[in-house]
Amino acid sequence: MLFDALLVLSFGGPEGPDQVMPFLENVTRGRGIPRERLASVAEHYLHFGGVSPINGINRALIGEIEAELGARGETLPVYFGNRNWDPYVEDAVTAMRDDGVRRAAVFATSAWGGYSSCTQYNEDIARGRAAAGDSAPQLVKLRHYFDHPLLVEMFAESIGVAAQSLPADLRDEARLLFTAHSIPVAADDRHGPNLYSRQVAYATRLVAAAAGYSEFDQVWQSRSGPPRIPWLEPDIGDHVAALAERGTKAVIICPIGFVADHIEVVWDLDSEVREQAADLGIAMARARTPNADRRYARLALDLVDELRGDRDPLRVAGVDPAPGCGYSVDGTTCADSPRCVARITG
């Protein structure tokens, strides 16, 4: 399959104080979230001047993708679109149409299956094509990449760097925690079932092994919504408190669920969890996310090559890449058929 463009598709984020509330209203539209709750979340962004890191990181990533294309001797225009803020996906697809693009690969800045991590990006693609009208380019989403060797390598390396930042006498006893964004249990059950949580669990095992850890914990973070609705657990804050009770003196936190420093990383982890850990007498080191690492750019182009048929899928050994599963080469599939469920649980 040939492509004449690449679309980097992401979540979006505000880039100034006056954009914070409109952005949050976009994110929560139709969910009935009280405005006072939005105002509370807005304070997290305002702590950083109303600027989310994500757009700047994505622009830097696009720069790395373009540089990598040049290093490979390839020419492929790269476009940028978001779900919730400027530049919107509708504008990006319309620009591609106006530039004469006929078929584009779509690289979503999410490594996972499930609804918000995959299906919603397919909905974004459909919305973008609808906005561009009858002459809209064909858009093909690239696969989930939770098991790509470069993603595993980047996270494993970042764990080692984080460990070295701890006091020398605490490094060997530090507990390694992998964290990802929690979602409602019912939502996880509907997609796969449990494709998202299974992929996170599998990637956690891959990265831990690559980093040289046989013992670690997988936790969840950033839940929202009414307490009566069950979300994936354990919550990272509850788990850190439990570790303190057991006498743990240091933790290394790897935000494996995030490919970039979203506000959930720089606020929820670097501010809230770090403050909690300090209050409990626990030293904390946070592993970096891929952000705009050149290897992340290479990963994106590897996926394009896979879909073009130029190379076999790159996966860490242990995952069956059978077509039709949520982790097939064509990333439009966001949940498994029943025959696929057992393939990433062993």
From Swiss-Prot:
Q: Can you tell me which family this protein belongs to?
A: Belongs to the ferrochelatase family.
Q: What is its main location?
A: cytoplasm
Report whether Iron-sulfur shows up as a keyword of the record: no
| Name by which UniProt lists this protein | Coproporphyrin III ferrochelatase
* Positions bound to Fe(2+): 181, 264
Gene3D superfamilies attached here? Answer: 3.40.50.1400
Pathway where this protein functions: Porphyrin-containing compound metabolism; protoheme biosynthesis
Provide the species name: Mycobacterium sp. (strain JLS)
Q: Where does Fe-coproporphyrin III bind?
A: 52, 121
Q: Cellular location of this protein?
A: Cytoplasm
Q: Name one GO cellular component term.
A: cytoplasm
The gene for this chain is cpfC
